[in-house]
Amino acid sequence: MSSGIPCMWMRGGTSKGGYFLASDLPADPAERDLLLLSIMGSPDPRQIDGMGGGDPLTSKVAIVAPSRRPGIDVEYLFLQVFVEEGRVSDAQNCGNLLAGVAPFAIERALVTAQIGETPVRIFMQNTSQVAIARVKTPNKRVTYSGDARIDGVPGTSAAIAVTFEDTEGSSCGAVFPTGQPIDTINGIEHHDR
């Protein structure tokens, strides 16, 4: 019998996936990715032999670790586990799973909960940016019950407010990809908003 790997499975925004401590996974990315493919059941359109839901929105992974960066609580690496391919990608970020990083960090004792609300400063490794997630923590415990609604998700839950620091140009290096607020291409003005 295998010993297993601790994992917290939860929804973040309109996605859901597995939240792991980095220390519980292989340090070698190739080994780690093979393990995650197995956990999710990929490649298979139904992911029948794993925990994935046969949809990119339910085949996601958050890897969380304590941070050594000044002023940062935790590091977050997002991985998309492809459903029908034996592939794992860190080429993008996921704001949906980001919303679950703070409650996970509190539940796994990476961050000490405060009375009422706990801010968690998160370094997003995929984009080298910082987000601050605020989690409701009455009695110093995460609450998942609340009246917040989001499109695409039935029911209500506790709101998690997320703010981002210094995100301008995180994907292309500039606020405006071409450096201009308006570009004319083939005689047509394109406004970059």
Stretches found by the model and what they are:
Residues 1-193:
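A glycine-rich beta-to-alpha transition motif near the start of alpha/beta enzyme domains, typified by
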